[in-house]
Amino acid sequence: MSNRFDSKPKCRCVAKIDDNYENNCQSKYISKCEIPRNICQRKNIDFFYDFRLKYSDADFDYVFGNDGVVTQNFTGLTVNSVPFTQTVPIGNEHPKWLKFYKDAFPLYNDREVIFETEMSGVQVIDGNSIPEKMKPRIRNVDDDLRLASGALNVIDPNTWMVFDFFVTNTAIYAFYERLPFGKTSSTPSNTTSQFGNKSFHDKFTHNGSIHNGSIHNGSIHNGSHCNPNPDVPTDLGNYAAFSNAIWVARRSADDPLSQFSKLAIGIHKGKGLVTWYIDDIPVFTWDRIGYRMHDEYRMVDHGGIEGIVSPDSMRLGFGTFSLFDMNLPNDYDRGYVDPVVVLPDGPHREIARSALIQLDFAANYRETFPDPYTGLERPLADPAITFAYTLGETPDDNRAIKLFGQGAIIKLKYLRVYTRSPNAKPEFSRVNH
């Protein structure tokens, strides 16, 4: 079979630049010879990690939290985080147990890359133990991913774009966010905190140590977000950071840990599309990666300027979570909005008040709903309205209200990453522009 790439130099006449070239063409041109390069064709991805056969911590060394116990047998992998036991005084502590596979997977311009698992999960929550001021802000414990939940996570630490599935007792959510860890903090310099005016990332790795936890091999093992890779950019400008959740499926609460679903997230870099699949059926598609979704899906906003983001590669992981500083999803927080709030600086409209616990400085949050007159982002009007519990409201840095005996368990059969054919017909759900 002949080689399609000819190693013989191919010559062409190009415009003469100076007299230093050998002139084998007309007087106005010179002979320039080039050897064509063999352009490497990207191979298809076909990665399969079968938890029914093996599990090694060494394979999942990109760590954001380890608040849980891992067991593996012929049925798969189980992560038991009941109860949650770890917290930090201040800062994003959404992940409790969260680990990613050691290698990143490239994204392709001409085809979709699929990140897949078969997964189940259960929340373990005693309704009687929920802190009193939270209760009016909870519609249904079995739906509420903020109290305790499990997740399949796909992340690009170079841009902090994240695409997830979150699982509760009765719901599956498509989750879309851009984490704020590459932003520069807007925390005022006079804030009374040992962290001072730090970036989000700096607050988690302050002077090489953190509260109630430790850094091991560059990763924080205490349930707090961090940047496990010191080479990852931590100042990407004032980009828009946010979290959005879309309820895409109903589960039965009878025995949720035994109810497995095939969950897959497909990313087509060239088309700028991300699609969430359940049992091979597309359930949601987003076509403006880097932009906020509509208000009805937004759970928290950290401000910033929107723009298209095109990740080059992603990491695949899974874990257990609480999301205390977020508002109710599915537009339910609209039922918890104060139409007009009169504060010392004047009246404020459309102030959300369904979030549970403030985890970070008020300056690092924005109102969930934009200014009704300008459509622009705006700072929190009053944390005491937005959150049931404000920062440091109770003794021991709110530890007792963050850890009230709740937890989550997840089970996974495998992780799979593969590429579709370049000629595969795209599959979409409701595309939101």
UniProtKB/Swiss-Prot annotation:
Subcellular location: Virion
Xref: InterPro entries: DUF6081
Main subcellular location: virion
UniProt GO cellular component terms: virion component
Keywords: Virion
Name used for this protein in its record: Uncharacterized protein L829
The species this protein was found in: Acanthamoeba polyphaga mimivirus
